[in-house]
UniProtKB/Swiss-Prot annotation:
GO terms under cellular component: plasma membrane
Enzyme nomenclature, EC number: 1.17.99.9
Domain topic, free-text comment: The N-half (TM1-TM4) and C-half (TM5-TM8) domains are connected by an intracellular loop. Each domain is formed from four-helix bundles and they align in a pseudo twofold symmetry manner. The N-half domain is the substrate-heme O binding domain and the C-half domain is the cofactor heme B binding domain.
Consequence recorded when altering residue 72 to A: Completely abolishes catalytic activity
Cofactor: heme b
Keyword Ribonucleoprotein: no
Location(s) in or outside the cell: Cell inner membrane
Active-site residues annotated for this sequence: 72
Subunit field text: Interacts with CtaB.
Family membership noted in the UniProt record: Belongs to the COX15/CtaA family. Type 1 subfamily.
UniProt KW keywords: Cell inner membrane, Cell membrane, Disulfide bond, Heme biosynthesis, Iron, Membrane, Metal-binding, Oxidoreductase, Transmembrane, Transmembrane helix
Name of the molecule in the record: Heme A synthase
Length: 330
């Protein structure tokens, strides 16, 4: 019971960290503190006159913006708190005889790597491949925490439900397609391409003749003093944005098909309805981002919607792939 409650708290806290990370990134505060783990050579944001003078001498090329610096440091503080929660979960799993052992250890290693990605995000000046990897690390972390939570709960029998037993492959494909779409979303955001297209449904103008696929999806974009606000030209950013929109159409179609097929199951009908509801919300948020020119609250909510969709699909896959006769734990 203690482990279950700790996992619930940690799941909510992880979602908070993801949303705070999105808020920091979308507020252009990713380099609010140009060093790591401190901020302008201090543990906290420098505010006193002597601290500001020292900070300016260390980073003469940076304009100190306390609001952005505090956003970045708050994100680091709560991420550190999440790390402590994950360590507590690992220790509890080690002490609990029938709890999984390898999965919590992997989660600990993942959050350590996530911390390294957070450092590289700053030291590599918001290099898009690092920023996207950091975003994916957060989504992977919350997904694995949910999986651990599901495995510590009493087992539910779903495999015997013949009406949905053959849907496991479709659910798995849907999960991987959604992950691909989340990657495209992260690539769009990290390359500052969210407003490259302002018309619906695909893009304005003769976009098909102006695609720049090679430039748009090159993981390494050369040497630059900073990648803040993006370094790609308009055509490359437009290509990224279009790929994300087309990916959204494919993903939405597949998830709707999965939800329709799951609706016949008495055990998974609620998850089917939740999936449809979250999908409608996510598409609405995506359209609102375009029409309203990326308002901060809606853009952050779009990140949160992606996380909730991912958690829903992880849960669906767990129940569909779980064999009730299996008693082994990793």
């Amino acid at each position: 019971m203690q482990l279950t409650w700790l996992l619930r708290i940690t799941l909510v806290f992880t979602l908070l960290v993801i949303l705070m990370g999105a808020y920091t990134r979308l507020s252009d505060a990713g380099l609010g503190c140009p060093d790591w783990p401190g901020c302008y050579g201090h543990i906290k944001v420098p505010t006193q006159d002597h601290e500001l003078s020292h900070a300016q001498s260390l980073f003469p090329d940076h304009d100190i913006e306390p609001e952005k610096a505090w956003l970045e440091m708050i994100h680091r503080y709560i991420a550190g708190g999440l790390g402590l929660l994950v360590l507590c979960i690992w220790f509890l799993c080690l002490k609990t005889p029938d709890a999984p052992k390898k999965l919590p250890l992997f989660i600990v290693l993942l959050i350590l790597f996530q911390g390294a990605l957070g450092m590289w995000t700053v030291t590599m000046k918001l290099m898009p491949i690092v920023v996207m990897s950091h975003l994916l690390g957060g989504f992977s972390l919350i997904s694995l925490l949910l999986l651990l939570y599901l495995r510590t709960r009493p087992r539910r029998i779903v495999a015997s439900d013949t009406s949905v037993q053959n849907l496991a492959p479709l659910a798995l494909v849907s999960l991987f397609v959604l992950i691909g779409q989340i990657m495209l979303g992260g690539w769009t955001s990290s390359n500052y391409a969210a407003l490259a297209c302002t018309a619906l449904p695909i893009c304005e103008g003769n976009w098909m003749d102006n695609l720049a696929i090679a430039d748009a999806f090159s993981p390494f974009q050369g040497q630059h003093p900073s990648f803040e606000f993006g370094v790609l030209d308009y055509h490359a950013r437009m290509t990224i944005h279009i790929a994300h929109r087309i990916g959204a159409i494919i993903t939405a179609s597949l998830l709707l098909l999965l939800a329709y097929r799951l609706f016949v199951s008495t055990q998974l009908k609620a998850l089917s309805l939740l999936l449809v509801g979250l999908l409608i919300l996510q598409v609405s948020l995506g359209i609102s981002n375009v029409v309203m020119h990326l308002p901060l609250g809606i853009a952050v909510s779009h990140n949160g919607g992606a996380a909730l969709l991912l958690l829903t699909l992880v849960t669906i896959n767990y129940f569909l792939w779980h064999k009730s006769s299996s008693t082994s734990r990793v």
